[in-house]
């Protein structure tokens, strides 16, 4: 599908006498017909099992052979791969555990994905503020869903985070989420919205499966309570105010042990 809201006129039909609205709709449709030749297109899949992931890499191979390019093809490009891993449980403490694991690995993920300078500069997949990270990693933080949603959207009133929790929170309590952030683009679903990786479809060595496996590191850490507690304590005590690169080095060394 075309990656431009402007190229998709609203589904609402203007009243018969509203000449300005009808003219605007015609203009939007005409502009959409023109810009569809250079606007990027998105590949959107329905929910799929992990076993089907190789079909995405095969699709990328075929598109690459037809001339498709990704972020690295131009300094002007800021294309991404967005994954929506289904949550194993909607229990707030389970979601919080995985979220904490992500916060601990996010600096490392940002480094190993080698996100382009343009995507780093643009607002669409920004890291969480360090003070919010510290609050979530605090040992005494045990929110229920209403408190978690309140704290998250008060500190992050945006979809533009590297791990967007808005769709998941809307699935749990849509009215509460939209009371904080009235954005029609938030679509409720029982998944995380992982927005960090670049699309490098023009590179034969690049793989959607590689990006998925990097996400799996988050789930593995979350599934190891002892390791999660140790990583949390180390980060909070020594690295929360340190340069990002220091924690990246520490995390890389820990993952290689």
Predicted feature locations:
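C-terminal accessory/tail domains of diverse enzymes
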Residues: 1-41, 47-58, 65, 90, ...
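Active-site palm subdomain of RNA-directed nucleic acid polymerases
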Residues: 65-74
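Short, conserved phosphate-binding/catalytic loop or strand-edge motifs used
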Residues: 75-82
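Structured core elements
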Residues: 82-84, 193
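Catalytic palm subdomain of template-directed nucleic-acid polymerases
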Residues: 86-88
């Amino acid at each position: 599908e075309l990656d431009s809201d402007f190229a998709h006129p609203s589904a609402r039909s203007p009243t018969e006498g509203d000449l300005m609205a009808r003219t605007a709709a015609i203009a939007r449709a005409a502009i959409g017909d023109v810009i569809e030749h250079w606007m990027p297109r998105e590949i959107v899949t329905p929910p799929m099992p992990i076993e089907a992931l190789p079909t995405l890499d095969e699709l990328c191979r075929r598109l690459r052979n037809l001339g498709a390019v990704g972020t690295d093809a131009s300094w002007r490009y800021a294309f991404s791969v967005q994954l929506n891993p289904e949550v194993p449980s909607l229990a707030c403490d389970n979601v919080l555990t995985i979220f904490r694991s992500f916060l601990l690995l996010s600096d490392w993920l940002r480094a190993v994905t080698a996100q382009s300078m343009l995507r780093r500069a643009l607002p669409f997949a920004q890291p969480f503020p360090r003070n919010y990270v510290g609050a979530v990693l605090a040992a005494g933080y045990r929110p229920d869903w209403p408190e978690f949603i309140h704290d998250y959207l008060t500190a992050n009133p945006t979809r533009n985070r590297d791990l967007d929790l808005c769709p998941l929170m809307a699935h749990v309590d849509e009215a509460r989420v939209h009371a904080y952030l009235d954005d029609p683009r938030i679509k409720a679903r029982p998944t995380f919205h992982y927005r960090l990786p670049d699309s490098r479809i023009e590179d034969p060595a690049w793989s959607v499966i590689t990006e998925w496996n990097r996400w799996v590191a988050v789930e593995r850490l979350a599934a190891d309570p002892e390791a999660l507690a140790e990583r949390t304590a180390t980060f909070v005590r020594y690295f929360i105010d340190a340069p990002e690169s220091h924690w990246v080095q520490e995390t890389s060394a820990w993952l290689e042990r």
